[in-house]
Amino acid sequence: MVSPGLDLELSFSQALQGFGLSEQAARLLWLPLPMLLVLVAAVVGVLVSVWLERKISAAVQQRIGPEYAGALGVLQPLADGLKLLVKEDIIPARADSLLFTLGPVLVVIPVIISWLIIPFGQNLLISNVGVGIFLWIAFSSIQPIGLLMSGYASNNKYSLLGGLRAAAQSISYEIPLALAVLAIVMMSNSLSTVDIVGQQTGAGILSWNIWRQPVGFLIFWICALAECERLPFDLPEAEEELVAGYQTEYAGMKFALFYLAGYINLVLSAVLVSVLYLGGWGFPIPVEWLAGWLNQPIDAPVIQVITGSVGIVMTVLKAYLLVFVAILLRWTTPRVRIDQLLDLGWKFLLPLSLVNLLVTAALKLAFPVAFGG
């Protein structure tokens, strides 16, 4: 038995009704809060990731890194953001101003919206939709349109080449990524991220999907890095070849949106790996033991708060371990060529993901208890 956890909307509504508000008014006040919470979580995740990037890259290169903007340079990401905010926003003379402005928006908004389906605990998520995985795949498929639009609208050969590379790379790696996720969906019999984590809570760490889907885990992680355009897959913005790719003509806030989208996507990918393969909010101590030690029923509010808090900590810790690995890979691996990138996606990862899906289906029929039959 697991703790039912917190229902954010119900708890918020009950709290406001306790102050005399009607149920309809409480629900109306709840409507803007999910996006506000998503924005706060995404921005905090970006700030932490940027700071980690600066410090880890400095350690790899035997430097100190930022140290003057706050203790250990923790305020350096804020300084970077403020600098980009006050820079002049320039639109090239012969660029398509509408598409030039719309491109960064189409890149960043789907990534932010995807956070709505991320569970940090049992019912501790903003939107518990039954097709959360499908929505995430659908939102992620919008991003290549914005990248190609930005490259085309800039009226710059480097930008156009970068946009074409970004679209080709995203399409090449989105298919094996989706097939890797389908194997997880097949085992959990659900498209809900909450159900997928719940399916991994039976035997603690031994029930994590990474043990049953090691190949799928590697496919997902490689494809996620390619979708985030991180080294060794940063072909769309290769400085030595394309200046800055589709971002070449961008400055100020529009450039900041690309910067923001890249890091939000990195943290989102790490959290999704945590949810799909590493047990999400699961932690070693069974809830029953904790409730017995505190002499409380398992559905007591204090148990819900403790398990919810620990669940958030476990999800974030697992995610930032993967962010650390991604940053380390960026500063220690060489860039692949565009032909190698496409060959890896179409000739290796796509067939491998299909074989993995078929093997998962066969194992589910042969061993229904172990593979979610």
Swiss-Prot record:
GO terms for biological process: aerobic respiration; photosynthesis, light reaction. InterPro entries: NADH_UbQ_OxRdtase_su1/FPO, NADH_UbQ_OxRdtase_su1_CS. The keyword NADP applies. It comes from the Bacteria. The chain crosses the membrane at residues 28-48, 98-118, 129-149, 167-187, 205-225, 267-287, 309-329, 348-368. It is a multi-pass membrane protein. It is found in: Cellular thylakoid membrane. Keywords: Membrane, NAD, NADP, Plastoquinone, Quinone, Thylakoid, Translocase, Transmembrane, Transmembrane helix. One of its GO terms (cellular component) is plasma membrane-derived thylakoid membrane. HAMAP family: NDH1_NuoH. NDH-1 is composed of at least 11 different subunits. This is NAD(P)H-quinone oxidoreductase subunit 1. It comes from Parasynechococcus marenigrum (strain WH8102).
